[in-house]
Design a protein with these regions (language model features):
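Extracellular hydrolytic enzyme modules, especially secreted metalloproteases
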Residues: 1-155, 161-168
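Active/binding-pocket-proximal capping segment
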Residues: 155-168, 174-186
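Extracytoplasmic Ser/Thr/Pro-rich, glycosylation-prone low-complexity segments
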Residues: 49-50, 75, 173-216
């Protein structure tokens, strides 16, 4: 519904009715269905907001920071950080759909030529590069701003992000995901608009001497 005058709800939210509340007030029904978990959204909320809350209800963690002193880990490259509508990271779609949206993310283990389709494609849409730490690795995916859900992205190119499998969502100060971007550091925001690698923008090397560089 639209924003009303109820003082208890100031923004979209997910929640669950507690057993204590139900025992005191009885079951809450809507259209003959008992309500347990719920999502409150306003009719003027953006499509991105609707998608973010729906995906969270399906198990996807929010990726935005709750404390402003830490850099945003993902930004516009995943709808769970926002603010615009875009595809979730391929790793997110693999992990939080139980392998039903994305079956697997193969690892690059040797020098070779690899085909990487854009992130909206069902196959060959990501690769991972392992590190010495079994809980950390890098993921490569190709983002195409000609895709209907990604038209707001600044450009097309290769996106590289780090995954910490022992973290969950926007855990502070080290999050589960971190998208590498120009001038980015663990404590420096950098420029998320300049995250992609391509021959067109001149970022075509990812090494200890490049900007950004692969810190873990």
């Amino acid at each position: 519904g639209s924003r009303g005058t109820d003082k208890g709800v100031h923004s979209p939210q997910n929640g669950e009715l507690s057993e204590r509340f139900i025992n005191a007030n009885g079951d809450i029904e809507l259209g003959g269905k008992k309500i347990k978990k719920y999502t409150i959204l306003y009719e003027r909320s953006s499509l991105a907001t609707h998608c973010r809350f729906l995906l969270n209800e399906l198990g996807f963690p929010y990726l935005y920071r709750f404390r402003s002193e830490y850099p945003r880990p993902v930004g516009m490259w995943d709808v769970m950080d926002g603010p615009e509508l875009t595809l979730p990271l391929v790793y997110n779609r693999w992990k939080y759909s139980g392998g039903t949206w994305v079956e697997d993310i193969p690892a690059i283990r040797s020098h070779a030529t690899y085909t990487l389709n854009s992130a909206d494609k069902p196959e060959k849409n990501a690769y991972k590069i392992l590190t010495d730490d079994p809980t950390e690795f890098f993921v490569l995916e190709y983002r195409n701003n000609q895709n209907a859900y990604e038209r707001h992205l600044p450009e097309s190119g290769l996106l590289i992000y780090r995954v910490h499998t022992d973290k969950n969502g926007s855990t502070e100060p080290v999050p589960e995901f971190y998208v590498f971007r120009k001038d980015g550091e663990i404590d420096q925001a950098g420029d998320l608009n300049e995250a992609l690698f391509s021959d067109i923008n001149g970022r075509n090397i990812f090494s200890a001497a490049s900007n950004p560089y692969p810190f873990i």
